[in-house]
Amino acid sequence: MREIIHLQTGQCLIQGNQVGTAFWQTIHHEHGLDHDGYFRGESTQQSDRLSVYFAEASNNKYVPRAVLVDLEPATMDAIRSGPLGNFFRPDNMVHGQSGAGNNWAKGHYTEGAELVDQVLDVVRREAETCDSLQGFQITHSLGGGTGSGMGTLLIAKVREEFPDRMMATFSVLPSPKVSEVVVEPYNATLSVHQLVENSDETFCIDNEALYDICRRTLKQAHPSYGDLNKLVSRVMSGLTTGFRFPGQLNADLRKLAVNLVPFPRLHFFTVGFAPLTTAAAYQNLGVAELTQQMFDPKNVMSASDFRNGRFLTCSAIYRGKVSTKQIEEQIRGVQAKNSAYFVEWIPNNVQTAHCSIPPVGMNASSTFIGNSTAIQDIFRRVGDQFSVMFRRKAFLHWYTGEGMDEMEFTEAESNMNDLVSEYQQYQDAGMDDDEAEEAYEEEEPVEE
C-alpha cells in the first residue's frame, strides 16, 4: 500500500499541531475508527486503504503514521489530555523545553537544530514500517518560529534522506489583518524561500480568509480557533480522499503533482471547500450548487482572489452520491463561462475526481485545488511588508544573534520576488507566446 507519513510542527491555535490533530479527528471518523484506534466501521471501503495513513499495531489497533513535533512541552501535554490522547503513539511525540519565541532562526538553526536528529530517528522508524512509502505531508504555520523555522529544517532534512519521495505541505500563511507577531513577514519569507526549493506541492491556507468564511458565510460572530481548524481539516480530508478511498484520479501524491504542477517552482495551490453553510441552512446540495460555491472566491481559503490571475491548472474532488455526468457538465460550464481565468496553452487543465463516500454528517461535498497565478498576491503582500522592515533593519538582531547572516535575508527576498515574476510571466503568456508553450512542453512530467 502507498503509505504517507504525516508530520506536524509548531503549536497552538491555527498552527501545525492543532490543524494536524483536527485532520486526524476528521479522518479517523471517516474510516470508522474509535478514539482508541479500533475499527468500528460498517463498510470495507472504510478499511480497504486504512494503511495509507494508519499502521496496524498489535491487538488490531490502528495508530496514525504521524510524528508530532514542538519546541515546548505544552502542545504535547494538550494533545495527550485531549480526546485523541490515546490515539497517537506516545514515542512519536517529540518536544523541546524552550520554544522558538516566534524566531525563525531559533527554529531553523539553534533550538530546532538540536531537536531535529531525534525527530529524524522517529521518521526513519515510521518509514521502516511502510511497504511502499509514497511520501510525506507536513502541517505548519509560516508566521511563528517553530512551524516556520523548524518545519522547513525538517522538510530539508527529510528531503535529503528520502530524495525520491514526495513532499506535500499544508502551510498556514500570515494574513494582512489577523497578525499576532511583528516579525511574521521575516519568518514567512525565509520559509517560502525554503519551500520553493524543497516542497513538491504546498497548499496555502490563510487565517484571514478562514475568519472571513466563518463570519460571512457560516455567520459565526466570534469564531474560535477550533472553528478555523475544523475548516482546514475538511479541506485536508477532501484533498486526501483519493489517497484514502478507492477512486480513479489523484490516487497518490505524485499523480496529484503531475496533474497540477506545470513548472517545478510553481507548486503553491489555493484550496476551497463546499458546502459552506450555517448549520440551520444546511440542505442537500446538488452538483450545480457545490460547483458554484466551490468556485466562489469568497470560499477560497487564502486571501488571493483568482479573478486577479489565471488558472494554470485546477482539480475538483466531489464526494457522495452524485452523478459523474453532471460533474463533467458543470465543470465544462464553469470553464466556458470563465474562460478568461484559465490559460489556454495548457490543454485539459481542469481535472475532476469522484469518490462515492461522503464526509461524516454530509450527503455530498466538493473540494477545490487551484494552481492560480493570483497566488502571487500573497507573496507580494508579504514581500512588501518584509522590505519595509528589512530596509530599516528592524528586529534583525533577533536573527543575527542566533547566528544568521544578513545575506540570507537578501537571498530569501530575491527568491520570493523571482517567484512573483514567474507567476506574472505565465499569467501574461498567451496562445501566441511560444516561449511559455515550449517551456511547458519541456517541463511536462511523465507519469510513472
UniProtKB/Swiss-Prot annotation:
Report the CDD domains cross-referenced here.
Answer: beta_tubulin
The protein's UniProt keywords, in alphabetical order, are: Cytoplasm, Cytoskeleton, GTP-binding, Magnesium, Metal-binding, Microtubule, Nucleotide-binding
**Cofactor(s) essential for the protein:** Mg(2+)
Q: Where does Mg(2+) bind?
A: E72
Q: Name one GO molecular function term.
A: metal ion binding
Specify residue ranges for compositional bias: Acidic residues: 430-448
Give the location in the cell.
Cytoplasm, Cytoskeleton
InterPro entries recorded: Beta-tubulin_BS, Beta_tubulin, Tub_FtsZ_C, Tubulin, Tubulin/FtsZ-like_C, Tubulin/FtsZ_2-layer-sand-dom, Tubulin/FtsZ_GTPase_sf, Tubulin_C
The annotated region (Disordered) lies at 424-448
- A matching Pfam family: Tubulin_C
Cysteine disulfide partners in this protein:
none
Entry keyword Disulfide bond: no
Sorted alphabetically, the Gene Ontology BP terms of this entry are: microtubule-based process
Give the GO cellular component terms, alphabetically: cytoplasm; microtubule
> Which positions does UniProt annotate for GTP binding?
Q11, E72, S141, G145, T146, G147, N207, N229
For this chain, the family text in UniProt reads: Belongs to the tubulin family.
Q: What subunit structure does UniProt give?
A: Dimer of alpha and beta chains. A typical microtubule is a hollow water-filled tube with an outer diameter of 25 nm and an inner diameter of 15 nM. Alpha-beta heterodimers associate head-to-tail to form protofilaments running lengthwise along the microtubule wall with the beta-tubulin subunit facing the microtubule plus end conferring a structural polarity. Microtubules usually have 13 protofilaments but different protofilament numbers can be found in some organisms and specialized cells.
General function of this protein:
Tubulin is the major constituent of microtubules, a cylinder consisting of laterally associated linear protofilaments composed of alpha- and beta-tubulin heterodimers. Microtubules grow by the addition of GTP-tubulin dimers to the microtubule end, where a stabilizing cap forms. Below the cap, tubulin dimers are in GDP-bound state, owing to GTPase activity of alpha-tubulin.
Q: Which named protein is this? A: Tubulin beta-1 chain
Q: Which organism is it from?
A: Colletotrichum gloeosporioides (Anthracnose fungus)
* Gene name tied to this protein: TUB1
